[in-house]
């Protein structure tokens, strides 16, 4: 039996990549598309909806969400309430929102995933960085994205910092008396480590994690040159969440 999929935000670049991936996989069936701004009523025989409420009662298994931080929480909550397993690539959730959604998924006995990054290489980078942080306490993160990205720092950078902070003693980096001649020059402060965000046209999604110690340095980097790099992870997530009974944060929990 094929897995029936809804894509929210299908007109965006990630949504278009997800549309292509789902329609090319014989194990998946696209049953609904959501975008509040389109005038289209259907695409290749698949119905298009302008409001999530119009999807209530639709027979579907998985809700794929590539929308905006402004609506992602409400969308994910709606999906769970309707019995859809959410696979969410939109970032910007607060810790409180994540906890609420995880609790709701347990009540509904539905699997789900919220992931800051679906590229397998990026997931590995986060894991490798957490391993290195046990031995290199001084670290800074540089994330680079296209200039249309709405949030900063990226969800991937925040997730990386969270994983590092779990194994690294809290430490304020840099000189104790350092001063910024321009506010923000040292980047965002996360538990003493610094996160820097770059936004430029031509970029897709890139991240460096730079460690420093006496007499040596270690740099880890991942690059997504095309949004197709995320689709292996999205495909894996769609097929895995239907087997689960709880929402998780981070693709690594499904690998």
Swiss-Prot record:
It is found in: Cytoplasm. InterPro entries: DapB_C, DapB_N, DapB_N_CS, DHDPR_bac, NAD(P)-bd_dom_sf. Keywords: Amino-acid biosynthesis, Cytoplasm, Diaminopimelate biosynthesis, Lysine biosynthesis, NAD, NADP, Oxidoreductase. The active site is at 145 (proton donor/acceptor), 149 (proton donor). NAD(+) binds at residues 9-14, 89-91, 115-118. (S)-2,3,4,5-tetrahydrodipicolinate binds at residues 146, 155-156. Transmembrane segments: none annotated. GO terms for biological process: diaminopimelate biosynthetic process; lysine biosynthetic process via diaminopimelate. It catalyses: (S)-2,3,4,5-tetrahydrodipicolinate + NAD(+) + H2O = (2S,4S)-4-hydroxy-2,3,4,5-tetrahydrodipicolinate + NADH + H(+); (S)-2,3,4,5-tetrahydrodipicolinate + NADP(+) + H2O = (2S,4S)-4-hydroxy-2,3,4,5-tetrahydrodipicolinate + NADPH + H(+). Pfam families: DapB_C, DapB_N. Its EC number is 1.17.1.8. CDD domains: DHDPR_N (cd02274). GO terms for molecular function: 4-hydroxy-tetrahydrodipicolinate reductase; NAD binding; NADP binding; oxidoreductase activity, acting on CH or CH2 groups, NAD or NADP as acceptor. One of its GO terms (cellular component) is cytosol. Pathway: Amino-acid biosynthesis; L-lysine biosynthesis via DAP pathway; (S)-tetrahydrodipicolinate from L-aspartate: step 4/4. Catalyzes the conversion of 4-hydroxy-tetrahydrodipicolinate (HTPA) to tetrahydrodipicolinate. Belongs to the DapB family. This is 4-hydroxy-tetrahydrodipicolinate reductase. The gene is dapB.
